[in-house]
Structure formats: structure tokens, C-alpha cells
Amino acid sequence: MQPSFWHDKWASQQIGFHLDEVNALLIDYWPQLELAAGSQVFVPLCGKTLDLCYLAEQGLEVIGCELNQSAVEQFFSDNELPVERQSSGEHECYRTEQVSIYQGDLFRLPKEPLEAVSGFYDRAALIAWPPEMRQQYVECLAGLLPPKSIGLLITLDYPQEALNGPPFAVSDAWIQEHMSPYFEIECLSTQDVLAENPRFVKKQVPWLTESVYRLVRR
């Protein structure tokens, strides 16, 4: 999957993965992590999600990473936030009170901006990668996060042959096998969400589940 894929999606506004409200599962399960106010939280492939605002409203310092410049600029303009921009190595850093977004390639993001991170949130990052790139992403994420960092992972699972991703299907078995070397894993919830996703219904996908995991970096 090339960067041009995501740039084209944003340019044509084919952003069905973007929600116009805070993710309900984030609201339901984030408090269980019990992160103190002032903690730093990393959100990979953040897009322009309103989840960043929710996390900031919990008193957290939010650090995102997003490939597409338009998505980053839309986050600040849509939410009417003042923003400062400065170069940071290979990335551009957009910063306002409590939210910083590094615009550029996640795989090229240095560790230094995340040295004080103690939390993380992945709703649309793991499931955005095709199977051949998924392990590379997991290793990248694990390499960026300090030990004992705690976070939420939200995934989708369905018969992959029934629909072309993204979002791609990620099974519990895959998570346990490929992420357990780096994270302690606890599944908090798995729900049938087929009826809530008309795209999947239209394509006659037989089943669709959404799961929430609590992860702790080893």
C-alpha cells in the first residue's frame, strides 16, 4: 500500500473511516485505563478524528501522527483551533494546546517525541494496513511506545474474501499470535455490528464484529 492511496482517499473525500462524532467505544472503555490527567497519549494514523478532542478534554496531552497534510489541517480548521507549525526532522509538527500532530510517514517517526508517552489509542490504524504490512506496523508501534504504556485497540473482523479492505479484517487469533510478544492483551468486548454498517450489508458480508482490547507494552 503506497502513500498515494491515502492521499487519493483524502483528495476525493472517500473517508468513510472518519466519524463525525467521538467513537462510542472510546467513551465507554477509555476510563478503564485510569490514566492521570497530564499523561501523554499517542494516536497513530489519527486523521482528523474528533477522538483527539475527547482525549484532550480528559486532561491528556495528545500526540498524533498522520500521513496526509490535508487531514491534519482540516482537524485544526474544523475545530477552530489555533495552530503553530514547525518542521521536526522529516515531519511537520502542528501544535495547539494539548494536541500535537506529526504530519508524515509513521514508519519514519523518531522515538524522541514519544519518550514520555504512557498511553495510546488505535481505532483505525491496525485495520488500515493490508495483511502484508500489518506486522511491520505492529513492530513500528511497539518500537515507538515506552514500556508499560497502556492503550485501547479497536478492531473489525469479518470474512476477508467477502470485501476488499480497508478496513481489513483482523482476527483475535492474529492479534494474540502477532502482538503478544510486544503487549499484554485483554479483550474487553466483542460485538456484532453488521446491522450498523450498511456498506457491509450491501456487499452481503455474512458477519461483522468489532472488538476492544486493552494493551500494555511489555
From Swiss-Prot:
One of its GO terms (molecular function) is thiopurine S-methyltransferase activity. Signal peptide: none annotated. S-adenosyl-L-methionine binds at residues 10, 45, 66, 123. It comes from the Bacteria. One of its GO terms (cellular component) is cytoplasm. GO terms for biological process: methylation; response to metal ion. Its EC number is 2.1.1.67. PROSITE patterns: SAM_MT_TPMT. Pfam families: TPMT. It catalyses: S-adenosyl-L-methionine + a thiopurine = S-adenosyl-L-homocysteine + a thiopurine S-methylether. Keywords: Cytoplasm, Methyltransferase, S-adenosyl-L-methionine, Transferase. It is found in: Cytoplasm. The keyword Transferase applies. Gene3D superfamilies: Vaccinia Virus protein VP39. Belongs to the class I-like SAM-binding methyltransferase superfamily. TPMT family. PANTHER family: THIOPURINE S-METHYLTRANSFERASE (PTHR10259:SF11). HAMAP family: Thiopur_methtran. This is Thiopurine S-methyltransferase. It comes from Shewanella loihica (strain ATCC BAA-1088 / PV-4).
